[in-house]
Amino acid sequence: MESIEKKEIRPLFIKERIAVYVYCYSYKGTRQLSKFGDVVYTSQKSNYSLLYVNNENLSDLLSKLKDLKFVKKVRVGHIKELDQNFSEAFAQTNLAVKEEIERL
């Protein structure tokens, strides 16, 4: 019981994470990528891996990844830059469909 009470309880904060695509020369080195972040997907055929890493140390991590022998290129995902509010696009599509129906 005492060991449970001594453990520190960490708060459940969600950290900003970003997708990083790592293109490799061969499939062999992809196992080493788990040191840098969470490997979500690895393609044997296309020789790339998808990592999720913390946004805080992104620049340091990118330079470390580029320095690895088996890495061809590193790309950062752009999902944060995109507008994820689709209500406007949905309204425009509805208007276009209604106009098409009225023409018929």
Curated annotation (Swiss-Prot):
Chief localization: cytoplasm
Subcellular location: Cytoplasm
Keyword terms of this UniProt record: Cytoplasm
Pfam family, one: DUF2129
Protein's UniProt keywords contain Cytoplasm: yes
Keyword Transmembrane carried by entry: no
Family the entry assigns: Belongs to the UPF0298 family.
GO CC annotation terms, alphabetical: cytoplasm
Protein name: UPF0298 protein YdgE
UniProt gene name: ydgE
Top-level taxon in the UniProt lineage: Bacteria
InterPro entries: DUF2129
